[in-house]
Regions:
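Conserved Walker A/P-loop ATP-binding site and its immediately adjacent core
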Residues: 53-58, 67-88, 152-159
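Conserved P-loop NTPase motor "coupling/switch" region that bridges the ATPase
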Residues: 68, 112, 129-174
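Charged, low-complexity
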Residues: 1-42, 89-93, 100, 111-112
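Catalytic P-loop NTPase motifs of RecA-like helicase/translocase cores
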Residues: 51, 120-124, 153-155
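Pre-Walker A (Motif I) flank of P-loop NTPase domains
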Residues: 39-44, 69, 142-143
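Walker A/P-loop
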Residues: 39-59
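Conserved helix-turn-beta segment of the N-terminal RecA-like "Helicase ATP-binding" lobe
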Residues: 65, 78-96, 167-171
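Walker B catalytic acidic pair
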Residues: 116-117
Length: 174
């Protein structure tokens, strides 16, 4: 099914409301939430330390409020505690997946897929990249948001192709 209208998603994001721990989203994070909510597939490539995790979670929360979806987060195991803490501030309970154990398909029902350290999928021949692409293309995935501070880890444009494929970008079709 189609995603709710952008205006409805922005209202559900409640961007001015403090988080449960008292923090507020910063202006660039609020802009990032609006940007993600306008896209079914996106690469959020803010620099390290700007709060990509919180931005993606706030956008996912809006989507979860407006549609019957679940939140799947792919992240290195070492970052799972960070994801849990940030999710708690938004009263979310994402299903955390490791890069080493991606499922063949998402759980039943619609899902938002957030992928942290997405540059791990820059080698189109790697098994983890293939597993991510299979998961991202599944019909139950309603949105795919990739997070990385280094979209071109080694400066080779060909490394962007798997990321573009995962989000369904038109450049990846050719």
């Amino acid at each position: 099914p189609p995603l709710p209208a952008h205006r409805e998603l922005i209202a559900a994001a409640d961007l001015q409301q403090p988080l449960s721990d008292g923090r507020q989203l910063l202006a660039h994070q609020r802009a990032g939430v609006r940007w993600l909510l306008a896209r079914r597939g996106a690469v959020l490539a803010d620099e390290m330390g700007l709060g990509k995790t919180l931005t993606a979670l706030a956008a996912a929360r809006a989507l979860l409020r407006c549609s019957a979806t679940r939140l799947l987060v792919v992240a290195p195991v070492g970052l799972h505690d960070h994801w849990r803490r940030e999710a708690l501030a938004l009263q979310l309970s994402p299903e955390l997946l490791s890069w080493a154990r991606l499922p063949q398909e998402p759980p039943d029902g619609g899902c938002v897929l957030v992928v942290d350290e997405a540059h791990f999928a820059q080698n189109s021949q790697a098994k983890r990249t293939q597993a991510l692409l299979r998961l991202a293309r599944h019909p139950r995935i309603r949105a795919v948001w990739l997070l990385t501070g280094t979209p071109l880890k080694n400066g080779r444009p060909v490394q962007l192709l798997p990321l573009l494929m995962a989000i369904g970008h038109p450049l990846a079709r050719d």
